[in-house]
From Swiss-Prot:
Gene Ontology terms, MF aspect: copper ion binding; nitrite reductase (NO-forming) activity
Subunit structure: Homotrimer.
Name listed for the protein in its UniProt record: Copper-containing nitrite reductase
Lineage: Bacteria, Pseudomonadati, Pseudomonadota, Betaproteobacteria, Burkholderiales
Domain statement: The type I copper site in NIR plays a crucial role for electron transfer from pseudoazurin to the type II copper site of NIR, which comprises the catalytic center of NIR for the reduction of nitrite.
Gene Ontology process terms (BP): denitrification pathway; nitrate assimilation
Cofactor: Cu(2+); Cu(+); FAD
Main location: periplasm
Stated family: Belongs to the multicopper oxidase family.
Provenance organism: Alcaligenes faecalis
Gene responsible for this protein: nirK
Binding residues for Cu cation 2: 136, 171, 342
């Protein structure tokens, strides 16, 4: 195990040197490409108001204003990286997760367009691997990955301007080991709201009563010669076997929020008839097809970009791997709604399913049982 970990460590650190060398090159190239775009000075950024936000565990999202109040500001977040064992199904299957803030997925961060997101990222000395973060919402230095490589016992602070409105993936991207870290749960999402809030593309404001974040995760768990899932003492011990499974491109589990059933039963998401709910859904690695059984997507940004007018009245929407999407729905009927990846094999056999538990009065005009199931 020690030798395996040393090999992994050397690979990571060798790649880190290359990525570190790339960062100033990328920064220089970015400066040439700015053209007439005005850059704020360090003094101007330092004078901006600051807001410190405490992140919450998914599927919940920290408190935020849907319409920006005042001008741009610096929004401060802190995330601590955890390497830990998690159980991903009822059979007790274990994975050595790599988790932003200890959750799979990592927390959803919300800012407004033209705000500055400032992240303090901490890699405790109790961890064994180098980590970093690549924000798909950011510009330059590999999404920040080239500036945030931290070994155990280190921290870094990254600030970037949120220039494009939408929902975006973030993930760990250590040189030479990006896929392994991503499929070990090290990904999450950020939402950059338009300063005026969401709109339907025709001038109508869209205001949600609740927001939930669903992070879809594919796991690749090795099996032993008897077909049983293997368990390992440390992340490095699992590396070679896990990569072999990864290369088949066939996940053993596809789950929402870290485990089979994580958002079902007494952990189901909740709403009431008439409530407007925004669902943010990310998949950092594979394509997915969200579908709300018994409902619809009234307004859907399938690729997650709010400058694009939303599609309306959708039954199923397609989110490409490495992206996040958003769907806005007003619940019309009470009961249990299943929210699934409509690759039904992945939903029913591998775990990509969640529930909404909705309260309120039934509307017979929308649906009624004319004849209950009975003998002919």
């Amino acid at each position: 195990m020690a030798e395996q970990m040393q090999i992994s460590r050397r690979t990571i650190l060798a790649g880190a040197a290359l990525a570190g060398a790339l960062a100033p090159v990328l920064a220089t190239t970015s400066a040439w490409g700015q053209g007439a775009v005005r850059k704020a000075t360090a003094a101007e950024i330092a004078a901006l108001p600051r807001q410190k936000v405490e992140l919450v565990d998914p599927p919940f999202v920290h408190a935020h204003s849907q319409v920006a109040e005042g001008g741009p500001k610096v929004v401060e977040f802190t995330m601590v990286i955890e390497e830990k064992k998690i159980v991903i199904d009822d059979a007790g299957t274990e994975v050595h997760a790599m988790a932003f803030n200890g959750t799979v997925p990592g927390p959803l961060m919300v800012v407004h367009q033209d705000d500055y997101l400032e992240l303090t990222l901490i890699n405790p000395e109790t961890n064994t691997l180098m980590h970093n973060i690549d924000f798909h919402a950011a510009t330059g230095a590999l999404g920040g990955g080239g500036l945030t490589e931290i070994n155990p016992g280190e921290k870094t602070i990254l600030r970037f301007k949120a220039t494009k409105p939408g929902v975006f993936v973030y993930h760990c991207a250590p040189p030479g080991m990006v896929p392994w870290h991503v499929v070990s749960g090290m990904n999450g999402a950020i939402m950059v709201l338009p300063r005026e809030g969401l709109h339907d593309g025709k001038g109508k404001a869209l205001t949600y009563d609740k927001i939930y974040y669903v992070g879809e995760q594919d796991f690749y768990v090795p099996r032993d010669e008897n077909g049983k899932y293997k368990k390992y003492e440390a992340p490095g011990d699992a590396y070679e076997d896990t990569v072999k499974v990864m290369r088949t491109l066939t996940p053993t589990h596809v789950v929402f929020n870290g485990a089979v059933g994580a958002l079902t039963g007494d952990k189901a998401m909740t709403a009431a008839v008439g409530e407007k709910v925004l669902i943010v859904h990310s998949q950092a690695n594979r394509d997915t097809r969200p579908h709300l059984i018994g409902g619809h997507g009234d307004y859907v940004w399938a690729t997650g970009k709010f400058n694009t007018p939303p599609d309306v009245d959708q039954e199923t929407w397609f989110i490409p791997g490495g992206a996040a999407g958003a769907a806005f729905y007003t619940f019309q009927q009470p009961g249990i709604y299943a929210y699934v990846n409509h690759n039904l094999i992945e939903a029913f056999e591998l775990g990509a399913a969640a529930h909404f538990k909705v309260t309120g009065e039934w509307n017979d005009d929308l649906m009624t049982s004319v004849l209950a199931p009975s003998g002919t």
